[in-house]
Amino acid sequence: MAHYRVSSEVENIMNRDRSHRKNEEEDEEEALKLAAMEKLQRLPTYDRARKAVLKGITGGFKEIDMKDLGLAERRELFDRVMTMDDEDWHGEYLRRLKSRFDRVSLHLPTIEVRFEDLNVTAEAYAGSKTVPTVLNSYVNLLKGIGTKIRVLPDRKKRISILNDVSGIIKPGRLTLLLGPPGSGKSTLLKALSGKTETGLRSTGKVTYNGHELHEFVPERTAGYIDQYDVHLPDLTVRETLKFSAKCQGVGTGYDMLAELLRREKDLNIKPDPYLDALMKASVIKGHKEYVVTDYVLKVLGLEICADTIVGNHMKRGISGGQKKRVTTGEMLVGPVGAFFMDNISDGLDSSTTFQIVKSIKQMIHVFDKTALISLLQPPPETFELFDDVIILGEGHIVYQGPREDVLEFFEFMGFKCPERKGIADYLQEILSKKDQEQYWANPELPYRYVTAKKFEEGFKIHHFGRAMRSQLATPFDRLKNHRAALTRTTYGASKLELLKACLERESILMKRNLRTFVLKSLQLIINAILIGVVFWQQKNYPSTVEDGIIYMGAIYLEVQMIVFSGFFELPMTIDKLPVFYKQRHFSFYPSWAFSLPTSIITFPLSFVEVFIVVLITYFTIGYDLTVPSFLKHYLVLALCGQMSYGLFRCIAAVTRNHVVSNTMGCLAVMWLMTFSGYVLSRNQVHKWLTWAYWTSPMMYIQTAVSVNEFRSESWKDGLGVAVLKSRGFFVETYWYWIGLLALILSTILSNIITSLCLAFLKQYGISKTAVLPDEREEADSNNTTGRDYTGTTMERFFDRVVTTRTCNDKKLRIPFKPLYMTFENITYSVDTPKEMKEKGIRENKLVLLNGLSGAFRPGVLTALMGVSGAGKTTLMDVLAGRKNTGYIQGEIYVSGFPKKQDSFARVSGYCEQSDIHSPLLTVYESLLYSAWLRLPPDIDTHTRELFIEEVMELIELKALREMLVGYVGISGLSTEQRKRMTIAVELVANPSILFMDEPTSGLDARAAAIVMRTVRNTVDTGRTVVCTIHQPSIDIFESFDELFLLTRGGEEIYVGPIGHHSSQLIEYFEGIRGVGKIKEGYNPATWALEVTTRAQEDVLGVTFAQVYKKSNLYRRNKDLIKELNNIPPHAQDIHFSTKYSQSYLSQFQACLWKQHKSYWRNVPYNAVRFSFGAAVGIMYGIIFWSLGKRKGTRQDIFNSVGAMSTVVGFLSSQSAATVRPVVIAERTVFYREAGAGMYSALPYAFSQVIIEIPYTMAQACIYGVIVYGMIGYEWTASKFFLNIFFTFISILYSIYTGIMVISVSPNQEIASILNGVISTSWNVFSGFTIPRPRMHVWLRWFTYVCPGWWGLYGLTIAQYGDVETRLDTGETVVEFMKNYYGYEYNFLWVVSLTLIAFSMFFVFIYAFSVKILNFQKR
């Protein structure tokens, strides 16, 4: 015992000694720090702003230049300041920053946004003009012309979006914008941020600190955060935010810091060195983007996926909720002073939404910034974070004022919010005609529907409204405007810095798409080898002009190959345009900064590619073997590659659409190549078309290369000059340098036009859904059951369960078998991404789901919940059988039997989060198509249609039945309409088990209630329904029966009943040691997420996954699974006699019906292809006018064959190129529908190829009739119809080739490259540039497998195969055809059958590829 006391005393002495030494060390460190800071304070302000005092490696403080701050030092500095120990680390950090400004009385800039009498209207067509079809596109064009010249009346209707709205968004107060869909929220946000869409008419006044929008640059003063997530899929999250930070710059941050340092020096104030260093790093070029990006990543909770690519629907990346946060982060990294945020919580769980809004609120309050945020379903705890609320309805402001007073106003209007009702939900539902009456609380007056206009009038006479008008009547004192508040410079950084940022981004994208560039280079090399082999040593002993012309054909093909190699720039450029347009609106950079880096990046690549091509072709063909000739030849072709890239980028910028760009690209190349001087010699060009010859860059390229070769020493005795003259080329050597100069100028011109188009043209096809007032009323009244369906508290749902079941039993009488699903120990893992391995993660596999078990039963509605990235969608994909990548372990049973995917697809439905549908069908047609293919074949047509009508009524889609689905974010249905249609598409399939991924995401409270009412009614019919859900309101959450709660890492932490008022869920978590009690009225869903975070686990010292696995609840669930897996006697597994619901013939009929509807409405494809056929026909008719009547010389025949080769060459290439975007646009829909077991791949494939036949025939007739008549071919029935037939079959096999190529390609870029190889090989062996008899014997066989050769054979021999007219050489045309081309008239039927066989072969390859290949990674 004595020994213990002595030891204890010694230990106490040692502890005191250590504590004393520690205090001495801290005092010494503080003295060193103060000395270093005093030294820094003596520096001039400019130097002081660029230097800081930090602790060095040796332990002492030293002065460092911020420019030399390394990555490790920057990270350490960031971690020191952003202390994560405190839950309120963000607020504490902001307060420390603000405190530093307050100590020197330095006021930060603030912005007060006012809007007075703001009106926004749009014009829209009414009637059939609103539904695009091939026919009415032409009719509308003519009507539009008639309207312009005032021959026809204007049939547009003016739609009012915002009606005389006025208000004030105050700095330092967080304002919430609420309103139902179509109320004008997005329009108001855009109008206030200075980004009103093109086509909308705006009147009224918007001011910032008393300054109107034209007095400063609103794009850089205010940040608008769109509800649509548009990002480059190949960039990581960090790269996306860093690029945004670079472009937006530091604003006035550096000037404010300099002023702060000056005042601190005057007052002898020494700041915290670490905070000082971080503030300086955040405004120093080269460091700002890193510091701010890391800060925003931490605030938004994106650190976990910072180095993961964003991805898209075809490329796996981050989750939908994470994408939404990236969209928000893009603006937060900038220096803007006012934020207008549109639906930033879509796809986020309620806990994450709360944390993000809380962080934004802290920023707004501490720095007096301005923010107006639109949310669809704000949970109560998030709603309470806001200071003010604006409620918008039908374009009228219903209320604007303090959040805590909003209920008082509606009580003044006679309405009262029930208990346990979310205020935000109540505020949105009260504007609905169907929901309003239940909140009426004035017994003295009978209820009458109160419109938004009436609410607005009531607000004006309320004291809140009078106070608002009084404030608006007093103008803002412009003298109080801080000079740094409003931005007056167009861009946030210098032009050079913006160019560098775009160049860096482009280099990253090129690295990520390196495979595409490698394949494109490989395409060029293969084509070069083909040309080199075909023209192998053609001029060993050139002795005639004919030899020279054959050789000139090699030059023509080489130039054509290089020109077409730039075609892949079309899809690559257009894919990036949506991001460009978004960033253009934000004034991130000038248009040339977007286009120029692509030219710079591809410049060395192009020169290397062309060098390899020239090495292959120059020596195999046998060009002049002197160094100057070789270098000059290479230089022209290298510049030709640059010209080609510039040309196709220019076409992409002009057309802005995949289909239209492919069409116009082919048209441009056809025009240019026709006037290259080879297809049609200069002497044969009509005088009125000589301008086209002189403006064609191809003419200068062909002339330069030809002059360089034929004026060389290899072509002696004037033979080279004779060859040039025979085709009308210039013979003077200076034409080489003229050609070189013309190439450089055309390249520069293309880039200038590209930049101008990017700067001034709007995004292609933008058209939003507009609901006219009468349609709104119809939407409100289409449900015949009226208010019996409109209860908004879930108690009303349960009160109606019996009634609903009875109603459903009477109406929805299509039978189904109730099924349950169990699963045990489900583990899902993927290969660890390369980006994560580069960060030091050594595991080969990344586990996303970790040993999950559970059971889903009929009549039980299960919520699958968890924070973003917990694995909710992943689990649903695994259970539904939609995963095609990764590694799945565990067991899945359906009603006790092992799950068989083919049978399971027949009895299950999956509502995907991304709402993937065919854009050119109407709502009703989409439902009819789904029911047609998925309901049992014994259901008659009448019953099926009645069933569809009832589903549409249930989900309130009747008012939208004739509306096109449209493209997401561009046209057609709104987000919430699209979501409801997704559910309806699955419900009409009458599934026994239904999976729903985020069914309420993107919906407002009322739409979410409609959806959940539908879901509840579906469950009550005895179906098994599982929903992932992010941010449910109390009402929605408590409509579920059971909860499957996941945490990060894919582990289950609660699987069981929710209970009345969430009692069982609350009881479970409150029973865990250390978990606090839920607050009265708090959302249980949000509370469950908040108390189970990883941070809470660290605080409590528990792992919730382990707690669950040790609980009685876990054991009960295991027993339940075991019990359900015990198959009862006489039970039978799900079995169907066929894999699909419908026969192959019915599948084909349904798919063909859908293709017919889509094609008839696909104006950019079919109307453009008809117009293209007419344009090309007229163009070639003019160029080759009356050429068919001339048959006196070989040159006449050559020119005529050249005209025919356009069908085989250019028209066919255009057809193959334009069909690719159409097919690939439907591919994602095909993956969803095939995954749902709707049809086999073969009926789908055959419907795709069959639907092309009538449209191709129409195109062939349009082109053929025009060309045939204008060129003047012989007017006999047989020759005319043969010409039409060979034109038709040549276009058709080319279209089938394009379809085939896209079916074996993961994306359009790869398809473009593969198509380039095929097109070049067909052109080389078509027999135009080098006829078959002139080919080497060992190569002639290839013409038999070349459709281009057969196509030209058929067109030529049908016209000239029986012509006995003698040529100037003495031989007849028939003899010339046989001797020169190898064509014989009696071979005509063989040619016809062969071309049909080629078409069928390409169809077979397409069908086979569609069946076995899947490029979607899930």
From Swiss-Prot:
Instruction: Write down the InterPro entries for this protein, in alphabetical order.
Output: AAA+_ATPase (IPR003593), ABC2_TM (IPR013525), ABC_trans_N (IPR029481), ABC_transporter-like_ATP-bd (IPR003439), ABCG_dom (IPR043926), ABCG_PDR_1 (IPR034001), ABCG_PDR_2 (IPR034003), P-loop_NTPase (IPR027417)
* Gene Ontology CC annotations of this record: membrane
What Gene Ontology molecular function terms does this protein carry? ABC-type transporter activity; ATP binding; ATP hydrolysis activity
Q: Which residues form the ABC transmembrane type-2 domain?
A: 497-710, 1146-1360
Binding residues annotated for ATP 2, in chain numbering:
866-873
So where does this one cross the membrane? 516-536, 548-568, 600-620, 634-654, 659-679, 729-749, 1167-1187, 1197-1217, 1249-1269, 1284-1304, 1310-1330, 1341-1361, 1387-1407
Q: Using the chain's own numbering, where are the disulfide bonds?
A: none
According to the record, the residues making up region (Disordered) are 1-27
Q: Which UniProt keywords apply?
A: ATP-binding, Membrane, Nucleotide-binding, Repeat, Transmembrane, Transmembrane helix, Transport
Expression tissues = Expressed in roots and siliques at low levels.
Presence of the UniProt keyword Hydrolase in the record: no
Where in or outside the cell it occurs: the entry states: Membrane
- Membrane topology according to the record: Multi-pass membrane protein
Major localisation: membrane
Every ABC transporter domain range: 147-419, 821-1073
Q: Could you tell me which SUPFAM superfamilies the record lists for this protein? A: P-loop containing nucleoside triphosphate hydrolases (SSF52540)
Tell me which residues bind ATP 1.
179-186
In the record, the note on similarity to other proteins reads:
Belongs to the ABC transporter superfamily. ABCG family. PDR (TC 3.A.1.205) subfamily.
Described by its record, this protein's role is as follows: May be a general defense protein.
Q: Which PANTHER family match?
A: PLEIOTROPIC DRUG RESISTANCE PROTEIN 1-LIKE, PLEIOTROPIC DRUG RESISTANCE PROTEIN 1-LIKE ISOFORM X1
- According to UniProt, the name of this protein is ABC transporter G family member 38
Organism expressing this protein natively = Arabidopsis thaliana (Mouse-ear cress)
**What is the gene name?**
ABCG38
